[in-house]
From Swiss-Prot:
It comes from the Bacteria. InterPro entries: Peptide_deformylase, Peptide_deformylase_sf. Keywords: Hydrolase, Iron, Metal-binding, Protein biosynthesis. GO terms for molecular function: metal ion binding; peptide deformylase activity. Fe cation binds at C88, H130, H134. The active site is at E131. NCBIfam families: pept_deformyl, PRK00150.1-3. Belongs to the polypeptide deformylase family. Its EC number is 3.5.1.88. It holds the Pfam family Pep_deformylase. It catalyses: N-terminal N-formyl-L-methionyl-[peptide] + H2O = N-terminal L-methionyl-[peptide] + formate. The gene is def. This is Peptide deformylase.
Amino acid sequence: MALRKIRTYEDEILRKKSKVVEKFDQRLCQLLDDMKDTMYEANGIGLAAPQVGVLKRAVVIDIGEGAIELVNPEIEQVEGSAVDVEGCLSVPNVWGEVERPQKVVVKAQDRFGNEFRLEAEGLLARAVCHEIDHLDGILFVDKVIRFVSEEEIEQRRSRGDKMDLE
């Protein structure tokens, strides 16, 4: 396993649409493992393949309940909405309030190509939507309602608020 370089907002790859994964092989497994290692090393809660320079529809997420791998994810259902603060490993030291669905149902495949559905709500739903946006060349700053200062982030952290600060 290896750490991969996280691309930042200046990199054009982050604005491109990712391709569907068609080969479920050792290279995909290696990519997913490397993405998890990279995400954990960077103290993130999610990482999409384009963020490590790979235009494939694959994401990893861990909001503290164990890693989830989503290959070729598609949002099938959304319910409700909520505004909360997000950040992104590809847009360092920038945070903002973003409106996202409160609940989502996602159809995806695992690393072996097996299809499954994931029902997510709250922070997990937010992280899933944020990462799927990356697969379509969308950054959270494109959806920010209000940018948030570092001081406000520190206040929220000191209260123990869970935020998608990737």
